[in-house]
Amino acid sequence: MKAAVLTLAVLFLTGSQARHFWQQDEPPQTPWDRVKDLATVYVDVLKDSGRDYVSQFEGSALGKQLNLKLLDNWDSMTSTFSKLREQLGPVTQEFWDNLEKETEGLRQEMSKDLEEVKAKVQPYLDDFQKKWQEEMELYRQKVEPLRAELQEGARQKLHELHEKLSPLGEEMRDRARAHVDALRTHLAPYTDELRQRLAARLEALKENGGARLAEYHAKASEHLSTLSEKAKPALEDLRQGLLPVLESFKVSFLSALEEYTKKLNTQ
């Protein structure tokens, strides 16, 4: 179990290099930057959509009758959560920095393996790209006369044009499939090599580095404990910030319920 957790952590901390394996080099982005970006997008979308729903409810007949002032409470809650996110930012950043530092050696070894395999398969990728561009240019040359013919003709030629294009499309599909199959065949040994290298790294870590693995686990647990302790004040601030909001909602709801009950009794 420890090995599995460590594997996931290391793969994540390598900068998701496997995801970019077939891509060109991109500007480096730290794991914390990726997590922060995803969390920010998710929270912003949730906040905006939630506020829209609250606004729609308050604008309805029932919302106006209850007069719960949900929109004011929603703004207060989102402000409180934004404050919490700002307070936890440095603490979480410190956690990721410590974890990256502890796994630096292992990440460098795995990055080296990825780069070596990438260098071996790059000629096949370049050749595939070149052939694909050639096929697209050949297809364009074959289709161009038909396009000109369509412009000169009328609608009655559409069916005839479709019959002429169908074989070309099938030919293009078959040729593309052949190139993809050839690329897959060329890359298969290197994919297996990369898989075997990764398995060997993890096996060596498990067999010969038991103490090292235990050390990783102990340090990760220590960092998590530190993160938990440092987050307590911010979470307490969140609780204190939400209490007035919840109390205000409770008072507004009970007041609206009492008023509604009185109206029912007078009818």
Curated annotation (Swiss-Prot):
Gene Ontology molecular-function annotations: amyloid-beta binding; apolipoprotein A-I receptor binding; chemorepellent activity; cholesterol binding; cholesterol transfer activity; enzyme binding; heat shock protein binding; high-density lipoprotein particle binding
Signal peptide from the UniProt entry: 1-18
SUPFAM superfamilies named in the record: Apolipoprotein A-I (SSF58113)
The keyword Lipoprotein is assigned to this record: yes
Ranges for the Sequence repeats: 68-89, 90-111, 112-122, 123-144, 145-166, 167-188, 189-210, 211-232, 233-243, 244-267
Tissue expression remark: Major protein of plasma HDL, also found in chylomicrons.
Gene3D superfamilies: 1.20.5.20, 6.10.140.380, Apolipoprotein
PTM entry text: Glycosylated. Palmitoylated.
One GO-annotated biological process of the protein: negative regulation of interleukin-1 beta production
Location, primary (coarse class): secreted
Keywords, comma-separated and alphabetical: Cholesterol metabolism, Glycoprotein, HDL, Lipid metabolism, Lipid transport, Lipoprotein, Oxidation, Palmitate, Repeat, Secreted, Signal, Steroid metabolism, Sterol metabolism, Transport
GO cellular component terms, A-Z: chylomicron; endocytic vesicle; extracellular vesicle; low-density lipoprotein particle; spherical high-density lipoprotein particle; very-low-density lipoprotein particle
Entry's localization field: Secreted
Methionine sulfoxide modifications at: 110, 136
InterPro entries: ApoA_E, Apolipoprotein_A1/A4/E
Region: 10 X approximate tandem repeats, residue numbers: 68-267
Subunit structure: Homodimer. Interacts with APOA1BP and CLU. Component of a sperm activating protein complex (SPAP), consisting of APOA1, an immunoglobulin heavy chain, an immunoglobulin light chain and albumin. Interacts with NDRG1. Interacts with SCGB3A2. Interacts with NAXE and YJEFN3.
Function summary: Participates in the reverse transport of cholesterol from tissues to the liver for excretion by promoting cholesterol efflux from tissues and by acting as a cofactor for the lecithin cholesterol acyltransferase (LCAT). As part of the SPAP complex, activates spermatozoa motility.
Family: Belongs to the apolipoprotein A1/A4/E family.
UniProt protein name: Apolipoprotein A-I
Gene name as annotated: APOA1
